[in-house]
Swiss-Prot record:
This is Citrate lyase acyl carrier protein. The modification O-(phosphoribosyl dephospho-coenzyme A)serine is found at residue 14. It comes from the Bacteria. The keyword Cell inner membrane does not apply.
Amino acid sequence: MKITKVAVAGTLESSDVQVRVQPFDSLDIEINSSVAKQFGEQIEATVREVLAKLGITAAQVIVEDKGALDCVLQARVKTAAMRATDETINWEAVL
């Protein structure tokens, strides 16, 4: 999947996460979280895993975490990535 435009998913509310995805020449992940020292590596691993499953190898991903659960982070990354592409989504593969 190729990222062709800027897209955002999520909110900045407590227990949520806002994920911004935009075109970039390589994979760049920025994590802003009050719990980054404890969970930063896990957050990055989750983001990388979701992007890999979607076949994304080049994008800038900015994660503004407000204490979201892992399942919420996965959903937000998927949603932002799908909004940021012009490709037809294979929903059977995604779900």
